[in-house]
């Protein structure tokens, strides 16, 4: 089995010839592509690499500010510099996707602290209004988060308060807002959690809620074309519940329900809004037919979420530019969701049926996207193992099992809707752009399986054990970072090579021009980039590079 391309000697003349062709093709591709400026939630792969790959798989360029502007881990991004960057590059853009959390506070982690005042935060988001005034015809999509229950686990000390503050926020909502029992435990928590930690938490929540409200008002005033307020990790009860209800009331009062979506999630929203831009660009709206591999979404509230899952599915599809259909004959995309088995149903039976259904659809030429939402933060190992042995993975349109159900859902839906929109558009792009888009598509698909199964189920547990052996903390690697990073690089590269076997030498469809369909063969895995972006092992950069011939 081929894994790595053998490097052979070429004559200088031949090398120069092919280099010239590549340069011409690259320039032609750039001229054909639309450009989207993305201000990400933070610098992690889910918020930068994922949207860029999904955009590239749909034939567009997604460009984010330089790394030094968007911060890293506990170092916040610079909203003022990012605002300048947006204004300096706005002329070249065809649209904007902007994280308010990055502009206002410096990113997701910084948004959970009260360091930035409300005055400072609102000052740094004024660029949103400026962009719409300068470019009224260009779409401005904005997303913000409704703060999660817990603080960020940036150290073992903060990890101690992670669960306590979550419990306090849930109990406060039950006892104070809803008159339910639990007052004694609430008082114990308030005496246990340091006053400074609790006050900072409440200060951040109040400020963020004010900014959430302001964004809804800006939709009504015409500065924002579509707004997503994503509920970060939550539960059915908590301070966020009251905040969400107030926001929904405001949305209804202003009659902007068609432009504002409120749903559980956070890290997937960049992908969702890239997909929305793609579908607007190509004037498409893919039809999704939804099938559940286990319990129906109306009967399940996923962990860390506060609404029924079917509600979340509907909201993600519409925000991504798609639509839901009740008749599978009308579907452009079959969305298969790997949900928990119903009581009394053997798990293996559900797995076999879902894999068989996937195989039935793909072999008959249907587009299938899979949301592996069963287990938080990783693939359902039994399911993806059976899937890989039974189904041609290159025939699957999109897959994700990463993090919360909402995260996995949004990544799957966004990738599927964007890729479908590109394949259905009639813009008459040149073949080089189809080739480039296909490479990006299959690279991201390989990334998803290798990351969600290979990293989360194999490498991550091994890395956790290794960290214990060398006396480090998985939440702050400190001076052990290089050791752990090398450990992860070696093993995740091997896992990616292993998953590449299901892509190697497969002929794949890349697009059509007129009446002619074009195909390429996945010929090699050229490179695998692996790195830990933050000094912890929760997430890893994984960027495989494929060659199609």
Q: Regions from the language model: what does each represent?
A:
Residues 7, 22-24, 108-110:
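A generic structural micro-environment signature
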Residues 28-549:
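An N-terminal assembly and electron-transfer interface module characteristic of large anaerobic redox
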Residues 12, 16-20:
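Hydrophobic core
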Residues 19-30:
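Sec-dependent signal peptide cleavage junction
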Residues 11-12, 528:
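Generic detection of intrinsically disordered/low-complexity segments and helix-coil linkers/edges
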Residues 1-11:
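Bacterial N-terminal signal peptides that target proteins for export
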């Amino acid at each position: 089995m081929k894994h790595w391309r053998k490097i052979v000697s070429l004559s200088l003349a031949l090398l120069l010839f092919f280099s010239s062709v590549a340069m011409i093709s690259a320039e032609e591709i750039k001229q054909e592509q639309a450009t989207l400026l993305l201000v990400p939630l933070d610098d992690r792969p889910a918020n930068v690499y994922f949207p860029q790959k999904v955009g590239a798989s749909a034939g567009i360029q997604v460009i984010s500010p330089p790394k030094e502007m968007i911060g890293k881990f506990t170092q916040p991004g610079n909203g003022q510099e990012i605002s300048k960057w947006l204004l300096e590059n706005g002329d070249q853009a065809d649209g904007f996707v902007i994280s308010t959390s990055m502009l206002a506070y410096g990113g997701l982690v910084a948004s959970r602290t009260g360091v930035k005042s409300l005055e400072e935060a609102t000052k740094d988001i004024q660029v949103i209004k400026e962009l719409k005034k300068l470019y009224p015809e260009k779409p401005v999509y904005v997303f913000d988060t409704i703060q999660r229950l817990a603080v960020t686990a940036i150290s073992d000390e903060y990890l101690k308060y992670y669960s306590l503050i979550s419990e306090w926020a849930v109990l406060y909502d039950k006892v104070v807002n809803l008159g339910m029992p639990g007052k004694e435990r609430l008082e114990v928590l308030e005496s246990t959690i340091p006053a400074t930690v609790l006050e900072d938490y409440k200060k951040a929540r109040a400020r963020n809620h004010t900014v959430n409200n302001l964004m809804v008002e800006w939709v009504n005033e015409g500065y924002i074309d579509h707004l997503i307020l994503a509920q970060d990790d939550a539960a059915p009860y908590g301070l966020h519940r009251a905040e969400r209800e107030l926001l929904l009331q405001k949305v209804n009062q202003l009659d902007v329900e068609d432009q504002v979506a409120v749903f559980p999630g956070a890290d997937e929203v960049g992908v969702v809004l890239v997909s929305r831009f793609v579908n607007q660009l190509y004037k498409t709206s893919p039809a999704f037919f939804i099938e559940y591999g286990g319990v129906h979404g109306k009967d399940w509230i996923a962990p860390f979420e506060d609404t029924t899952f079917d509600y979340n599915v509907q909201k993600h599809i519409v925000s991504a530019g798609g639509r839901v259909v009740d008749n599978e004959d009308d579907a452009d995309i079959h969305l298969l969701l790997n949900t928990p088995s119903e009581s009394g149903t053997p798990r293996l039976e559900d797995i076999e049926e879902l894999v068989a259904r996937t195989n039935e659809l793909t072999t008959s030429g249907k587009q299938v996207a899979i949301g592996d939402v069963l287990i938080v933060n990783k693939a359902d190992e039994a399911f993806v193992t059976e899937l890989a042995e039974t189904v041609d993975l290159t025939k699957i349109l999109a897959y994700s099992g990463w993090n919360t159900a909402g995260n996995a859902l949004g990544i799957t839906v966004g990738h599927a809707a964007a890729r479908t929109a590109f394949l259905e558009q009639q813009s008459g792009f040149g073949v080089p752009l189809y080739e480039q888009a296909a490479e990006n598509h299959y690279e991201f698909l390989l990334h998803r399986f290798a990351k969600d199964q290979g990293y989360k189920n194999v490498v991550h547990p091994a890395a956790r054990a290794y960290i214990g052996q060398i006396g480090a903390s998985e939440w702050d690697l400190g001076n052990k970072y290089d050791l752990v990073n090398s450990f992860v690089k070696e093993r995740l590269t091997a896992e990616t090579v292993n998953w590449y076997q299901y892509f190697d030498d497969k002929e794949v469809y890349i697009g059509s021009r007129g009446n002619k369909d074009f195909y390429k063969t996945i010929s090699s895995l050229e490179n695998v980039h692996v790195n830990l972006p933050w000094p912890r092992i929760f997430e890893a950069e994984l960027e495989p590079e494929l060659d199609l011939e």
